[in-house]
Swiss-Prot record:
Glycan-modified residues: 33
UniProt keyword terms in alphabetical order: Cell membrane, Disulfide bond, Glycoprotein, Immunoglobulin domain, Membrane, Receptor, Signal, Transmembrane, Transmembrane helix
Protein name as annotated: Triggering receptor expressed on myeloid cells 3
Induction description: Induced by lipopolysaccharide (LPS). Interferon gamma (IFNG) decreases expression.
Extracellular face residues: 20-138
Positions on the Cytoplasmic side per record topology: 160-183
Location (main, coarse): membrane
Top-level taxonomic group: Eukaryota
A GO term from the CC aspect: plasma membrane
Membrane topology category: Single-pass type I membrane protein
Alphabetical list of InterPro entries matching this protein: Ig-like_dom_sf, Ig-like_fold, Ig_V-set
Pfam short name (any one): V-set
Gene Ontology terms: biological process: cell migration; neutrophil chemotaxis; neutrophil extravasation; neutrophil-mediated killing of gram-negative bacterium; positive regulation of innate immune response
Amino acid sequence: MSPLLLWLGLMLCVSGLQAGDEEEHKCFLEGENLTLTCPYNIMLYSLSLKAWQRVRSHGSPETLVLTNTRKADFNVARAGKYLLEDYPTESVVKVTVTGLQRQDVGLYQCVVYLSPDNVIILRQRIRLAWCQGKPVMVIVLTCGFILNKGLVFSVLFVFLCKAGPKVLQPSKTSKVQGVSEKQ
């Protein structure tokens, strides 16, 4: 095996180990909604409170929405545009943020809320970022789609023109078959 392949494999393994420490980045446009799920250990946290928090650079995270019930089947909490749905039987928390605005840019986390100073982060933190290039990307993809279709039809047209009258003339075998069928 070549040293280059070994080196690439090692780099892939190392980068995979570091990925758990990184944040998940999501970009949004004004007015969009964000929905994500946070799985948790059913044996440990099914009856614990859950929360959605904004992480500040200094000080404690700000709790935006917190469940206040510990039912075994379903717990829900709403605070403004934040909705938290806890499904203990499925061991997952569903977070929905409606009507995202520019001021929502920042770092967030989904947690098991044991106390204000004691939380357990359920998944990678989410960094919300403002998307400015998304409309441009839609235009580029649309133009690419149109150009691609134009290219396909141009090639098809060239092949049909090269085939010329051969395509339009009936073949000799069909005339012979037609005569034998009449007899």
